[in-house]
Amino acid sequence: MRNGAHRCESAMPGVTMTVLGCGKLGTAIIQGLLRSCPKASEAAPQKYLYPISTVIAAVRSKDRLESLIKSLVAEINDHTCPLDFVIANNVEAVRRADVVFLACHPNQATECLGGIGMQDAISGKLVISVLGGVSVATLEQAVYSSTRRPASGQAPCHIVQAIANTAAARQQSVTVVAEEETANSHEKGSLCEDVLRRLGQVSYVSPDLMPAVTALCASGTAFFTTYLDAMIQGAVSEGLGEDVATRLAALTMAGAANAVISGEHPAAVTSRVTTPGGVTAEGLKVLREGDLRTLTAKAISATTRRLRLVDEKSRKQS
């Protein structure tokens, strides 16, 4: 088989997407991209401005390829988007792409982008980095060394920093974009948003806020599920079965989140379900005594600080 050979047929031309780094988030992005394409059994209308021609997964080894294919069986079988693979050749994977997702480990960014031939392969292309704590400036430095300029005759790539989460697999990611103003920002902007809408909702912030956004939207998933697990275990200790407790706790959290998404302030939701001296107030008293608010705020702050340190370290290494 040529680098990759698991393909579905599609007659619709469009853009080729390459994903560099097929760990948890990279795999989730591939799943979301494939699921955004029409199902093989349906003649669904095109929902997006830029149809996908092919998704290319860049993997390190044949073992990783086999593992990835197993995790993508449902998407490969159910959707019309062709899926291809490139093994141990990031430059070739980028050369074939119109859009590149950078989803490797942050410490591997320089290795992924600094290979021989990468400047030529990446020239003029949209690069969407989902690396937490690695700024656009650091990635440009990795591609163009100390000059941060493309070689003569080469168009610069356009790097966009975006924070997504693994809900991208279900097209439910909250993706936040910090797009730096460059000469081709507007040219690439509509393509970038169209691609990211395939993974969920898209919002924009200034680049300096990205560490805090990453702590909230990416790491925040783990913080929410840690609290969710604590609620589940509390209910189990009171006699509920774990399956029932898990479902009820998750639905309760989703209901509270939907109320806030609909416009209610979190404090208003709390007040609405709390009667002074009642049973909910008794539980909230315990949470206040444990200083849950302060601990949670400290977790966000600690994560944000760590992300800034990661970027500083990456910048020194590139």
Swiss-Prot record:
Pfam families: F420_oxidored, P5CR_dimer. Belongs to the pyrroline-5-carboxylate reductase family. The gene is ucsG. One of its GO terms (molecular function) is pyrroline-5-carboxylate reductase activity. PANTHER family: PYRROLINE-5-CARBOXYLATE REDUCTASE, PYRROLINE-5-CARBOXYLATE REDUCTASE 3. SUPFAM superfamilies: 6-phosphogluconate dehydrogenase C-terminal domain-like, NAD(P)-binding Rossmann-fold domains. It comes from Acremonium sp. The keyword NADP applies. It comes from the Eukaryota. HAMAP family: P5C_reductase (MF_01925). It is an enzyme of class 1 (oxidoreductase). Its EC number is 1.5.1.-. Gene3D superfamilies: NAD(P)-binding Rossmann-like Domain, ProC C-terminal domain-like. Keywords: Amino-acid biosynthesis, NADP, Oxidoreductase, Proline biosynthesis. Pyrroline-5-carboxylate reductase; part of the gene cluster that mediates the biosynthesis of UCS1025A, a member of the pyrrolizidinone family that acts as a strong telomerase inhibitor and displays potent antibacterial and antitumor properties. These compounds share a hemiaminal-containing pyrrolizidinone core fused with a gamma-lactone, giving a furopyrrolizidine that is connected to a decalin fragment. Pathway: Mycotoxin biosynthesis. This is Pyrroline-5-carboxylate reductase ucsG. One of its GO terms (biological process) is L-proline biosynthetic process.
